[in-house]
Every structure is written in C-alpha cells, then in structure tokens.
Amino acid sequence: MGKTYSSPVNPIPKAPKGLAIHHWLNFLQAAYRLQPGPSEFDFHQLRKFLKLAIKTPVWLNPINYSVLARLIPKNYPGRVHEIVAILIQETPAREAPPSAPPADDPQKPPPYPEHAQVEPQCLPVLHPHGAPATHRPWQMKDLQAIKQEVSSSAPGSPQFMQTVRLAVQQFDPTAKDLHDLLQYLCSSLVASLHHQQLETLIAQAETQGITGYNPLAGPLRVQANNPNQQGLRREYQNLWLSAFSALPGNTKDPTWAAILQGPEEPFCSFVERLNVALDNGLPEGTPKDPILRSLAYSNANKECQKLLQARGQTNSPLGEMLRACQTWTPRDKNKILMIQPKKTPPPNQPCFRCGQAGHWSRDCKQPRPPPGPCPLCQDPAHWKQDCPQLKADTKGSEDLLLDLPCEASHVRERKNSSGGED
C-alpha cells in the first residue's frame, strides 16, 4: 500500500535548505490557492523538487518560473505543476512597475491609486476562484504550532519577530485574528503594553492618512476586519508588528540577567549560555556585544572576577576575557589536588623517642618508653608486663608444681591388684 499523507500539522512548512525565505513564501502562497487545498504529500513533493532544482545550473535569482516549469519531470507526483503554473500567472503582476501620475496632470499629489492586480492571499482569509474573499478564524492547531516555534524566544526578540512575521505573511490574519494571536502567545502584561503601543501607532497613522482609509466608515481596526479590505489589512498588520519593537522593555527581569556562572563551571561554557540567552531574549535591533561583555564580568564567579580584575580586563573584548580565564581551574580540580598526599622532607631535629635524626617520632621503630617506674620493682626502664620479678614468680610456681611427690608406677600397680582381690 502507498504511503498516506495527512493534512500538515505545522502551518508554516520549513523551507528547503538553500532556498530564501521570501522565495519559499511565494511557493506557499501559490500552494494555498489550490482548490482543494494542498496536502502534506504536495508539500513533500514540492520540497523534494526544489532541492533538486537548486542544484541545477539553470537556477537563477530572481527565479524564472517558466524555466523552472520545464525542469519538472513528466508525470511528477503531487501538484507541483499547478503551483508553478500559478506563480507563472502572477509573475507579470509582481514585476510591473508602480503606477505614476498621468502626464497631463503632473501636479497630482500622492498617494497614487494602487495596481489593480493584487498578491495572492492565504488562510485565514480565503480567496476561492470566482468567489468573494471569505474569512476563516484561527484553528487551535495553528496557534499551537506558532506558539511552539516561539516558546524559547522573548516577545520582540529577532527569533520571535521572524516567526510571527512569517506567520502573518502566511495566514494574512485580520485585526481580530491578530488580537487572538497576541492573547495566546504573550502574557496579559505584555499584551497590555503592546495594545497601548498599537493604539499610539494607529492614532498617528490615521492622522497622517492611509491609502483606502475612510474616517466615516469607522476606526482602522474595524475596517481591517473586512476580508475585502486588503490594503488596510496590510497596513494594520505592519502596525501590529511595529508595536513589538516599540515596547519600552521587558515587563519583568529578563531571563539572561539571572544567568550566573557556577562555582565549578568553566568560563567559556558560561559565556556560551549567555550568548544563546541574549539571542533569544534581546529585542530586535538591540546591540548585543556591550551587554554580553558586561554580563560576562558581573555574573561571573568570584574567582574569575578576581582574575579579570588583576589583569585589568573587566570591560575588555570578549576574546581577551576568554583567554584570561583559560588558566582558571574549577574548584573540583583543586579539591582533588588538595586530597593527594604531600611528600614532606625529613626533619633535621632528633626524634623524641630514640634521639636520632632522619625520621619523625610517629615513624620511629623504637618502642614507646613507659610512663613511670614499674610498680613491682620500681625500675623506670620497662613496663610491668616486662618486669623480671613477674617472670621469676611465674617460673617459681611452675617449679613448685614439678616438686610435688608422686607415687611410683610399681606401687600403683600393687594397690590396684590388692583392691581387685578384695
């Protein structure tokens, strides 16, 4: 049986290696215009074909979709032919120059009327062939997939903005959809600050004037919810994204500010953790090197701080700080070195026991002298257990036992015989 492919769980399929993101977005937008919608098998075959097409010499930048269509093998599985055909139809509209004021009215001020041909849109705003644009709300699997992509990034960081910007280009959400996305991705405090910045940007945009905006039709947020108002929806999406970069700062202490070097952690590992945390936590456009140098010294352990202070490199370039701390040994290695026995030289003074030099008293082979005279003979040269009198008394008792009278053997035999006769 053939392999079955279900609908894609990730709403933003990964781009093939070597293909630019904006080119991959064009292919995705064309794929989502297919009726019925594309399946996971279609995306799999599209990625497989693009990986092979990138290696061919006819691959150009910008992409010539007509030449790319000739590279598709006959009876190629999937709907790659239809996707490339949609891109070929949209190529003239994308390459058309912007409209200019007519020659008979050179004083006509901007903005000039938009081009009649518009870019293809994706979910949740649907553009079926021959029917007006309709709206489809977010699905939970879409929100979960986007949140999984930004789970390790702080709001406003480059990774966060790249993922959210790609999702906005992919799904073309309305103002209500963007509000739901913000509530799902960020905390209530971040959402409140974002809402304040967004209201300020909307007020400035309404004052300056936006192409297609009619003040009599209601606020910009209401008009951007209309699926047919593509231009206003794009303007609102740009303002919504700009509100992240205008945030005054993190609502709580950033995670990278609490990263400290452990007492036994190498300095290079600590700096690597700091670098990864700053990449995921700094707002977009914030310089990273000054913050990294400052935290590399202020959050280091006491040993590394003393080493950097002694060399005068508390605010030096990061490479010099790493070289300065290369010779630092963690505490666990110092403990091992301290446990090893040290070879001490023999003393020059005489031993307290034998009076000879060359060894310590604890290593002396001469027995320890008695603490006082022997209680038996009052001789201070030996212990009681070694006293000669004690040994003499023991020997005398043995001699007394040997001097006891004993009967001869013939006398015992005579007694035994007489007793037996009786």
UniProtKB/Swiss-Prot annotation:
Residues 98-113 have a biased composition (Pro residues). A motif (PPXY motif) lies at residues 109-112. A motif (PTAP/PSAP motif) lies at residues 98-101. It comes from the Viruses. One of its GO terms (cellular component) is viral nucleocapsid. Pfam families: Gag_p19, Gag_p24, Gag_p24_C, zf-CCHC. The record marks L123, P124, L337, M338 as: Cleavage. GO terms for molecular function: nucleic acid binding; structural molecule activity; zinc ion binding. InterPro entries: D_retro_matrix, Gag_p24_C, Primate_lentivir_Gag_pol-like, Retrov_capsid_C, Retrov_capsid_N, Retrovr_matrix, Znf_CCHC, Znf_CCHC_sf. The keyword Hydrolase does not apply. GO terms for biological process: viral translational frameshifting. PANTHER family: ENDOGENOUS RETROVIRUS GROUP K MEMBER 24 GAG POLYPROTEIN-RELATED (PTHR40389), IGE-BINDING PROTEIN (PTHR40389:SF3). Late-budding domains (L domains) are short sequence motifs essential for viral particle release. They can occur individually or in close proximity within structural proteins. They interacts with sorting cellular proteins of the multivesicular body (MVB) pathway. Most of these proteins are class E vacuolar protein sorting factors belonging to ESCRT-I, ESCRT-II or ESCRT-III complexes. Interacts with human TSG101. This interaction is essential for budding and release of viral particles. This is Gag polyprotein. It comes from Human T-cell leukemia virus 3 (strain Pyl43). The lineage of its organism: Viruses, Riboviria, Pararnavirae, Artverviricota, Revtraviricetes.
